Amino acid sequence: MTVLRRKLAEAKAEGRAALVGYYPAGFPDVASSIRVVQAMVAGGCDVIEVGFPYSDPTMDGPVIQQAADRALAAGTTPKDVLAVVRAVADAGAAALVMSYWNPIEKYGVDAFAADLAAAGGSGLITPDLIPEEAEPWIKASDAAGIDRIFLVAPSSTDERLAKTCAASRGFVYAASLMGVTGTRDKVAATARRLVERTRAVTRDSGLPICVGLGISNGAQAAEVASYADGVIVGTGFCQRVLDAPDVDTACQQVRDFAAELAAGVRAAAR
């Protein structure tokens, strides 16, 4: 069992959703990004998605794009991404990488799976890879013993939901809004319906469903935690680092934000 699956099972046993935080490796630099993810874990994140900075992020909103651009400008490498993964694992959380498929192909699919596992990573989220085109990754992740997380969206047909959930391991990522990432004043009404539709597919397998895109405060985290197995937050963490005058302040604000979200998932009515 991967650390990811163990963390999700532990949260379920506590009667709550897991808190999943996203943060791009190398923003504003590698050493600072390690401090930030450590603060996220200290604040209550069960799982950290380490973003693999990429120059053409089709799903990312302006805040995460800005963070990724700065990480690339700072010279962040794939090895740096794996160093951040190791830091997350050492801090006691489950570590995932979230990456578009091109950088993984460029690295080498089998090599990335092996190196991610060696760094203490539990798996990979691939927002632009569909199961039908994922055979090399399915084989590589099986060989490395790590999880693979695919995405479903409100536009997904029932057939697409079934295929995606069957191919996913660890959890399936329910993107609750059409379009790019970012905080929203209200969590999309489509999120609950998407989880209901996905749950109909995963009922037998028990595959957890984690919801992302648009969660910006503890109350929204509680709302989503009332029906999802995990609550995914990224933009809010990046925004706090962008706004902070220095890394010490950024880490404190990130830790406080994680604590607010963690309190939210624990307060949810389930």
From Swiss-Prot:
Pfam families: Trp_syntA (PF00290). This is Tryptophan synthase alpha chain. GO terms for cellular component: cytosol. Keywords: Amino-acid biosynthesis, Aromatic amino acid biosynthesis, Lyase, Tryptophan biosynthesis. It comes from the Bacteria. Belongs to the TrpA family. It catalyses: (1S,2R)-1-C-(indol-3-yl)glycerol 3-phosphate + L-serine = D-glyceraldehyde 3-phosphate + L-tryptophan + H2O. Its EC number is 4.2.1.20. The alpha subunit is responsible for the aldol cleavage of indoleglycerol phosphate to indole and glyceraldehyde 3-phosphate. Pathway: Amino-acid biosynthesis; L-tryptophan biosynthesis; L-tryptophan from chorismate: step 5/5. The active site is at 49 (proton acceptor), 60 (proton acceptor). GO terms for molecular function: tryptophan synthase activity. NCBIfam families: trpA (TIGR00262). Tetramer of two alpha and two beta chains.
